[in-house]
A protein has these predicted regions:
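Short, Lys/Arg-enriched, disordered terminal segments
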Residues: 1-5, 22-23
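Sec-dependent N-terminal signal peptides
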Residues: 4-15
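Hydrophobic alpha-helical membrane-insertion segments, chiefly the h-region
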Residues: 17-21
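C-terminal/domain-edge helix-coil "capping" segments
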Residues: 22-31, 46, 57, 92-95, ...
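N-terminal segment of the mature soluble domain
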Residues: 27-32, 41-84
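Conserved beta-strand segments of the P-loop GTPase G domain that flank and frequently precede/overlap
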Residues: 33-34, 104
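Residue-level signal for short, function-critical loop segments
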Residues: 36-38
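Short, solvent-exposed, polar/charged sequence segments at loop or secondary-structure edges
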Residues: 61-103, 109-115
Length: 158
């Protein structure tokens, strides 16, 4: 009886560990780039906050890991000017074993509101797999909620 109990506990521990490991290793890796501001009117701190909030929202979504890396800097300099994902950037992200790249843009609509747009691009083929946008007040208190909503719309599509 005691042997059966020990075997049952060991089996349960093995199944629990493999389930947790599978959930951990099956997470989709998303590289999150700098926020594009084609107008040049958005404060750098606001763009950093938006990127941070999107990284948090993606990372806190079940099945996803968000990555923001300083090593993207050289690519982001060119990316900030165009808003396009170059083949060099896709190749670099693939080498880092990232499945997706999140590209975001903030556009001032007036003095109080902005449009946050984002798309998730598959690094293996360059296809946009999800795209969404949200209009919000350009205030920190509203931006986090808008980023959470944006991330929810994006990860629900892949």
């Amino acid at each position: 009886m005691k042997t059966k109990f020990i075997l049952l506990v060991a089996l349960f521990a093995l199944v629990s560990t493999s389930t947790v490991s599978a959930q951990f290793y099956n997470r989709k890796k998303v590289a999150i780039t700098e926020v594009v501001d084609k107008s040049g009117d958005v404060a750098p701190g606001t763009k950093t906050f938006i990127r941070s909030a999107l990284t948090d929202a993606i990372t806190n979504s079940d099945g996803y890991e968000g990555y923001a890396s300083i090593s993207f800097l050289s690519f982001e300099v060119n990316f900030d000017k165009t808003g396009n994902v170059s083949s060099a950037m896709l190749t670099y992200v693939k080498k880092q074993l990232m499945e997706y790249i999140l590209v975001s843009e903030v556009t001032p609509l007036d003095k109080k509101t902005v449009l946050l747009s984002a798309r998730i691009v598959n690094t293996s083929n360059g296809k946009i797999v999800a795209s969404s946008s949200v209009r919000t007040y350009a205030d920190i208190d509203y931006l986090r909620s808008a980023c959470n909503s944006l991330a929810y719309n994006l990860v629900g599509a892949i």
